[in-house]
């Protein structure tokens, strides 16, 4: 039963976690409870409301100072428009994970990406442990008793099971009582059905009240300076759409996960980019707007008006998408929301993960003690988790392990301040919001939007498909434009000699390998039985061998493809051009290799690293409060640092598209000299001396560096 006591704030958020991990509401829970004693009144529109005026092109309600920093390469933007117009989910996914979707196009791109996302096609959500326990208990009770105990969980025994139990218990009675028993069974079934329906209605009403309450908390979170906020007509319609979407999802998936406040926050954060009301531009403002803002909603084009006005005919194109599109995407908010939850809360199926781990050293673990088995399991998880993903408990443990390894100073300070040690109460729930709910509620909408782009664009390469297949799916994209997207952010490099001698020769010709070869090869032969060592090598080789698919083309081929629209002949010429005297780097189509939720761990570490200087100056309470409401990574330069705004803008953009293999300087002049191209970068910054830089692309790039640093350190320890 969903509790409605004073502690319901914490119970509603702890239902989808293990017993040792709690994600209750943040430290403002007491304020929320006091200010929102009657949530219904907060969401009910008044009898007379001020109509919301459409925002015109010249409207300056959103000042330049409050507009987010945004720069985007014009070629990539036009390519994104081309893929959007043709509903090319292959191309849109590529841009989403490599560069990010332009925020003004997310409302049309996200539905397309979600429809084809692997986690939506094959969904799996980690079931709540409470539901599993209650379901098991209800089944055992129904088999041992002829009467129902009135289980209140979404998973309950059917009336048929209860009826069968009653018949079995009454099987020893006289035949003369059969008619009476049948009548009693019918009466009991009728009573059970009506009782169950009434019980379900009560549960649904309780869930709906919790949803209303959590929606009201969002208003209070934004309008904390106002004791009472009047919800307008359009705002009320949006909140009603959100409420119905959350309710339908809960009813559909209630047998797997209970309602949790995170479900409401996911809907609220989605509504910050995707207009809930069809054919309108209204989205929720997000926490970046001041509490004095006149409304909870805003025209999402206003934030990027400078960028829009710098591109001819872009505003007209966007208005056609908003008000007149019937072809590209007409999916409802409820459908987008359901699919988004399936992606954000996805968890790998236990059987598939167990098979992969059991295949490595199964015979060696058989005769070990229980303690050794647990230790060995952790070693194997470190090598399988990056590719397969894991439960939230495993990801939290992995996060803490990587934090200690990659950011030891901050980890030590967290240890001194007792951060990451109190998952049983309200203290460290921020980490669950970061990792399990993918930044919902606690991150800036602009940072979260870019990170969600990355997760929605996550795609694995089909090993049965070759380069020509994917290049055709990308509509033979121009080589220079493809180069701007760079390699997979979480790329890794393996040693080709190790691939040959380590993978092929060890098993078949281990005794014939020359001892004078590389030391690493000798170590691998001597320690062939060491699961930890061989598995890490296998992980690196597997990631590097299938990192991307590519074709090697000659310089002439590059000139041909870049000077005109790419054609199928470009890839056909590739094999014959391999003998040319002048060979350029491969044409690469990057694909994802690391599980998106594991990648999110390194993105979270990168965010912590960027805030390290701030965090070490805060005390325990301030750290938790800060991490529960992380400020945006967009900020304004001081006046003394505005002497080179163009250089900084170029650097910020280049860092998000650089394909430098070793994480060199964001500005890669060599690449520009090899692939001459006009880098036209449009900015959303105002034309005055104030200049802002958005670091979220740098944060994601740094996450890739942390990933390679961790992988390298593990390999060094193995040797």
Swiss-Prot record:
Span of domain Rab-GAP TBC: 100-459
Bias type Polar residues, positions: 374-386
Keywords assigned: Cytoplasm
Family: Belongs to the OCA5 family.
Originating gene: OCA5
Designated name of the protein: Oxidant-induced cell-cycle arrest protein 5
Biased composition (Low complexity): 1-22, 135-159, 169-182, 648-660
Cellular location(s): Cytoplasm
Source taxonomy: Eukaryota, Fungi, Dikarya, Ascomycota, Saccharomycotina
Region spans: Disordered: 1-66, 132-205, 351-386, 558-588, 637-674
One annotated Gene Ontology cellular component of this protein: cytoplasm
Residue stretches of biased makeup (Basic and acidic residues): 183-198
Domain of life: Eukaryota
This protein's record includes keyword Cytoplasm: yes
Main location: cytoplasm
PROSITE patterns for this protein: TBC_RABGAP
Biased composition annotated in UniProt, kind: Basic residues: 638-647
InterPro entries associated with the record: Rab-GAP-TBC_dom, Rab-GAP_TBC_sf
Entries under SMART domains matching the protein: TBC
UniProt keyword Chloroplast present: no
